[in-house]
Every structure is written in C-alpha cells, then in structure tokens.
Amino acid sequence: SLKLCGICNSRKMISGENHIETDLWKSILETSPEVTDLEVFTGNIIRQNLENSVFIDVTASNEPVKHYNELLSNNIAIVTANKRANTQDMERYSQLHASAARRNTPFHYETNVGAGLPVINVLQSLINSGDQVIKIEAVLSGTMNYLLSEYDGGKPFSELVAFAKENSYSEPDPRDDLSGTDVARKCLILARECGWSIEEPDIEVEPLMTEACAAAKDVTSFFEVLKNYDTPFHDRFLDAAAKGRRLRYVAVIENGKAKVSVMEVDEAHAFYSLRGTENCISLTTKYYQQYPMVIKGPGAGINVTSAG
C-alpha cells in the first residue's frame, strides 16, 4: 500500500513523521504552518530512511531537480514528470544517471515523452536487448498535432490557434507550443536514451510561427501579428494537399543529429491519419528496419499521463 509521508507545493509543505491521509492532503497542506524549503524537505526524507521511499515530482521547476542526485545516492527512488532533469547539460545529465546506476536506485520518467505512452520503457527494453536505434520519427506535441490535423483551410490558422487556447488545447501563451521548444526537449530526451551525446542547442528547430510572432510583447499582440501568417500557412497547406500529403510537426533523430520541423507526409506514412492531440513514435532499429515499430495514442490528458 502507498503511504504519503510528505508533500509540498511552491508555498507550503508537510514533512513530519506521520502519514498523511491521502483524501485530505489538500486541506492539510493548505493549513500547514511550514513554509516550503526543499533542502529541509528532502533532508527529512533521507533522515527518515523509510523502506521503499519514492520521491515524486510533478512540477516543471528546476528546484526539485537540484536534489535528485542526493536522493538517488541515498536510495530514494524518483518518479518524475519533470523534463528538466533529462534536458539539463550533458555533464549533469550523465552525473544524474550515474548516481541512479551506482546504487541501482529506480529513476523513472516515462511521462517526459508521449504522456502515458510507453515510449521510454520500450526504447530502453530494445537497447537492453542488444537492438540499435537507427532512426526515430515522432509527433510529440498534442497541441501541434491538433492544429495541423484540424486545419482544413476553411478558417484562418490564427482563428484555430485562438480556439485551441480558449479550449485549453494549448498553453495560455500559445507561443510556448508554436516555438517548438517543448518538442525539441522531448527530442533531446529520446536522443540521449539512444546513447547520443547532444545538447539542446544542437537541435535544429523550425517554429510554427514567424519571428515577429515570437517577438510580440504579449499574447494579445501575438494574435494580431499571427494573422500575417494566415496566408503563408494556407499556401503551404494547399501545396501539400495538391500532392496528396498532410502537414505534421515531426521530430527526427538520426545519426546523432536531431531536427524538429513541419513535414509533409503521404498516406503511406504512420503520421498521415493522426487526429486531435494524438502522439505517434516510429522506431527504426536494427531489428525493426523493414517495418518500424510504431507507438501511437493520446498525447495529453490527466488520466493517461498520471498512469504513465
């Protein structure tokens, strides 16, 4: 059975000896007099030395990541949805994974890529079995796939982006999605899992917006500037459609190099039929060359992500 022994957010924490009622954690945390101090919080976890301790990180902050090495070195397992640990510079990344391997401490981060899809586990299993990754093609953004799969030329691209924002299909500032940065970070994680030593700046990124959109002073201004991209995007859509192809935002990893960009795919491609916020990963390996392994499913959602 799972026993909750500590919990914190950016403001308050509970880190005593007593177990916390899981159905009351929210109210208990809100009334806690303890101000969050991750140094104290992680120190208490190590000091308590409970059997089968697990540190769970569901933030997007770099602060918890600073304590990963110490936790792993003290046999505290880590389960994290936070991509920052696996996208920091290669030296720190290597140190972190060495800490986990040295003590054989579990370090799980499946949801870093593909929400609840079993991407990381499958990749690790293939490599551990002696397989060798030749190429990865992946649609890794539910937001990007929604925009590109739903666009049919009937309404401007800027209106579709606005609809995605209003319905929480995108980040509050859609530029966080359209910049391609999040996809690049997921791409970086996959490349490193394959054994390639690369840094985030090494990845070639094509944003799904103009430089003027990125430079807009706020979200309102961004949407005004985005209207100027409606016609160029429509022309690109029509050009692909005339060849029987569809546009997809794809990460490609091959020969130690990585790129994320808009790609045209034909009906024979695994990404052609993707709809909504689906993610899809195609793995071409030594054992799966003629018919690449394809992993496909929801790329977003509370239930599937938490299950991952």
PLM segments and residue spans:
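General beta-strand structural signal in soluble alpha/beta enzymes
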Residues: V54-D57, I78-A81, F107-T111, K135-A138, ...
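Catalytic, metal-anchored helix/loop core of enzyme active sites in primary metabolism
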Residues: K135-E137, N145-L148, F163, Y169, ...
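Rossmann-fold NAD(P)-binding glycine/threonine-rich loop
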Residues: S61-S73, K83-T111, A115-L126
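Substrate-binding/catalytic subdomain of NAD(P)-dependent oxidoreductase enzymes
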Residues: E150-Y151, E159-S273
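Conserved active-site and cofactor/substrate-binding residues in soluble primary-metabolism enzymes
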Residues: L50, E91, G114, P118, ...
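N-terminal glycine-/serine-/threonine-rich beta1-alpha1-beta2 phosphate-ribose binding loop
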Residues: S1-S73
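Short acidic, glycine/serine/threonine-rich loops at helix termini
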Residues: G16-T22, M90-Y93, P118-Q124, L148-D152, ...
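Rossmann-like NAD(P)H-binding beta-loop-alpha module
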Residues: A101-N104, H108-S170, D177-D182, L188-I189
